[in-house]
């Protein structure tokens, strides 16, 4: 408790110093410019208990992985400080640092939970994250890279995140970086997409604009991670957002030295922007193959949690090709978007008698078709942004005894529709937002929200997540029914 109070005061003091500096303009130390924000988030729960924390082999058990049974009061309460330090070293060379500091207070304010590690990183090569901390506090050097620009060449070297594609809510082309799901899964404000939860990795990234007359902005991009592998980071078992049932234990088997290699060509022809993409990398999500069974629950003290199925979490190499097209439909005042990828060797599991025995490969084709259009709805106010998306996932080959990485049976096709509305008011001081996602197998995610810009440095976000539907297979949106809840964020920017 004393340590938690100390960390709280440290973050408040750092944030206060940063905010005070904003009153005098941009904060500088020599040639370095410092910007960033401090944020406080409260995410009370309105749903039932998370079944993953109570799923024992013998059936639901209470209190399971929690200190006491029942639905929690909070899913998350945290504060964090995000800094961006930029230095221009010469006309062509610059350097960027992005340190972040987290303090998770959820366990302190909600006695439903035992002590768990809020920032687990149990895999070979965890030093690649540049993180340090304890159960409640985490400090990381999230990004660290050099930028070099000379003529048509742009080079970025270091720990960085790379975003391809523009799909909202689901990833099609945006699969270069794994995701950090340890705190909030991906249920934060949807309009921010995955910017805050992509895990930056060590890349050499080079862009070269190819001189030509037909396509003046024709650009080739190459990226290489020489083998500093980081998998998807999941919440700890026993935590509010735990995704792994209590009777499972996944041992990450991450092979360092496996490179990530990719490239794309982008350009504009008339009203059409296009990209052609290629990427090969170890699969981000662990593919859990049966390794052992721990039968400790059959011996005194007969604790049902002591019976566990142990899975070997493997990360086989995948290859992905794809592309995108954006069309500026001037007559309709709309942007038409399309993204597609094909992964010929996506990993699945051969599951016999509920036991994943080996990895099998199947081709997977993902496509998103989208329309974005600004439309004047409220007289005297800015236009409303309206975005509609259609997602399809097609899995080829035999699906007999086939399960995905969540352990769910696999459909040949899965279809999802999304609608996003954003209405700015009062010179963009207030923004009303609504995101809706509907899975045609009967599942949904609805997120209404409001954003209020208070002055020049303070922002208040109020949102609500609601999940539901009859489709509750693990990994489908209906399975997150327990994650219903409001969240409020106060952000002080500088």
Could you say what each language-model-derived stretch is?
Residues 30, 44, 73-79, 137-142, ...:
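Residues that define the transmembrane beta-barrel architecture of outer-membrane proteins
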Residues 76, 279-281, 335-350, 356-437:
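Detector for outer-membrane/organellar transmembrane beta-barrel domains
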Residues 81-87, 97, 143-148, 204-208, ...:
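Residues on the lipid-exposed face of transmembrane beta-strands in outer-membrane beta-barrel proteins
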Residues 93-240, 270, 465-471:
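Outer membrane beta-barrel
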Residues 480-494:
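Outer-membrane beta-barrel "beta-signal"
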């Amino acid at each position: 408790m004393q340590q938690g109070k100390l960390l709280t005061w440290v973050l408040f003091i750092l944030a206060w110093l940063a905010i005070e500096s904003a009153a005098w303009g941009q904060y500088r130390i020599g040639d370095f410019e410092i910007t960033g924000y401090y944020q406080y988030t409260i995410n009370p729960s309105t749903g039932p208990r998370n079944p993953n924390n109570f799923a024992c082999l013998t059936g639901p058990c209470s209190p399971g992985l929690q200190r006491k049974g029942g639905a929690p009061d909070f899913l998350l309460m945290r504060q964090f400080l995000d800094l961006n330090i930029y230095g221009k070293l010469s006309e062509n060379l610059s350097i960027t640092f992005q340190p972040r500091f987290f303090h998770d207070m959820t366990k302190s304010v909600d006695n439903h939970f035992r002590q768990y590690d809020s920032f687990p990183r149990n895999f070979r090569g965890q030093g690649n994250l540049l993180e340090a901390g304890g159960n409640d506090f985490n400090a990381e050097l999230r990004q660290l890279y050099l930028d070099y620009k000379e003529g048509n060449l742009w080079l970025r070297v270091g720990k960085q995140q790379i975003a391809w594609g523009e799909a909202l809510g689901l990833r099609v082309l945006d699969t270069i970086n794994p995701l950090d799901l340890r705190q909030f899964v991906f249920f934060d404000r949807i309009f921010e997409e995955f910017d805050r939860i992509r895990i930056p990795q060590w890349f050499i990234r080079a862009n070269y604009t190819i001189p030509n007359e037909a396509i003046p902005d024709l650009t080739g991009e190459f990226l290489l991670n020489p083998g500093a592998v980081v998998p998807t980071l999941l919440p700890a078992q026993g935590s509010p957002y735990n995704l792994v049932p209590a009777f499972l234990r996944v041992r990450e088997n991450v092979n360092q030295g496996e490179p990530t290699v990719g490239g794309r060509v982008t350009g504009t022809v008339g009203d059409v922007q296009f990209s052609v993409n290629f990427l090969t990398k170890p699969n981000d999500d662990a593919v859990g193959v049966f390794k052992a069974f721990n039968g400790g629950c059959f011996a005194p003290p007969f604790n049902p949690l002591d019976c566990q199925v142990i899975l070997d979490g493997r990360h086989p190499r995948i290859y992905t090709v794809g592309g995108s097209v954006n069309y500026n439909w001037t007559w309709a005042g709309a942007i038409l978007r399309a993204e597609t990828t094909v992964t010929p060797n996506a990993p699945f599991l051969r599951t016999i008698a509920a036991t994943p025995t080996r990895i099998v490969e199947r081709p997977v084709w993902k496509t998103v078709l989208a329309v974005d259009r600004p439309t004047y709805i409220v007289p005297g106010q800015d236009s409303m942004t309206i975005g509609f998306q259609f997602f399809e996932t097609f899995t080829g080959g035999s699906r007999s005894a086939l399960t995905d990485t969540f352990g769910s049976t696999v459909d040949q096709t899965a279809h999802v529709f999304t609608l996003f509305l954003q209405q700015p008011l009062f010179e963009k001081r207030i923004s009303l937002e609504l995101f809706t996602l509907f899975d045609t197998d009967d599942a949904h995610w609805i997120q209404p929200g409001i954003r209020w810009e208070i002055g020049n440095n303070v922002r208040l976000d109020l949102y609500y997540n609601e999940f539901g539907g009859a489709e509750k297979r693990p990994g489908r949106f209906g399975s997150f029914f327990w994650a219903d809840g409001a969240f409020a964020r106060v952000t002080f920017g500088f």
